């Protein structure tokens, strides 16, 4: 292992691309087998479904999940679609379309997104519907809203707001949103996707360039020359 360490700093090192790939692949397999598979097996043994919304090394990190998930939709109404894609599409966790695609590939019924955290206390039901519509059009059919706080005392008030619970001025209207979201989920679940285009996931190439998969593949090496490339 020590003999291969220079490959992480010098892309001209012998077999540097393979060494880098093997490093990320090893971390990915260890994470998936030592954590996800064990939790998934325990859930199955106890008749529970294993739902995950986790950082992923690659698309197949959630292979052992019964419900695959992601974390996106954290903005006020009006952001251009181009901004949404630029902000979220490069990260497995925040790419709603990648989540629904993975669910389809694995034959899973549900694709889940956790949404609404950190939008702020100015978030309205109109903002919520706008984000839900976008998730539904991306194939998401299970919606996990962040969060329903039992209290907003002290620092809790500032922990990735808003609360969707009693403290929210829109709470008395929440049934309308809940009914709408329920209908959206049923519709998407019972809709067949007409997929005509396949997009190659370039994760292998990004790994060889030391792209960090947990944070949208930014370069994580120390070579200024390679970073410019």
Locations of regions flagged by a protein language model:
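Carbohydrate-binding surfaces of carbohydrate-active enzymes
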Residues: 1-229
């Amino acid at each position: 292992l020590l003999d291969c360490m220079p490959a992480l700093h010098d892309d001209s090192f012998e077999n540097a691309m393979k060494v880098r790939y093997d490093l990320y692949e090893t971390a990915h397999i260890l994470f998936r087998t030592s954590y996800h598979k064990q939790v998934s097996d325990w859930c199955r043994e106890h008749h529970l479904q294993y739902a995950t919304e986790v950082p992923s090394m690659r698309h197949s990190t959630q292979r052992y999940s019964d419900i695959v998930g992601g974390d996106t939709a954290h903005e006020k109404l009006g952001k251009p679609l181009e901004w949404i894609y630029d902000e979220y599409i490069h990260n497995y966790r925040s790419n709603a379309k990648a989540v629904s695609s993975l669910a389809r590939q694995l034959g899973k019924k549900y694709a889940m997104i956790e949404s609404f955290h950190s939008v702020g206390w100015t978030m309205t039901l109109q903002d919520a519907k706008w984000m839900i519509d976008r998730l539904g059009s991306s194939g998401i059919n299970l919606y996990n809203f962040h969060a329903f706080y039992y209290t907003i005392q002290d620092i809790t008030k500032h922990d990735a707001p808003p609360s969707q619970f009693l403290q929210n001025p829109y709470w008395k209207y929440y049934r309308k949103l809940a009914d709408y979201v329920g209908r959206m989920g049923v519709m998407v679940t019972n809709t067949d996707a007409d997929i005509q285009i396949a997009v190659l996931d370039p994760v292998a190439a990004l790994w060889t360039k030391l792209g960090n998969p947990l944070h949208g593949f930014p370069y994580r090496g120390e070579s200024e020359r390679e970073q410019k490339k």
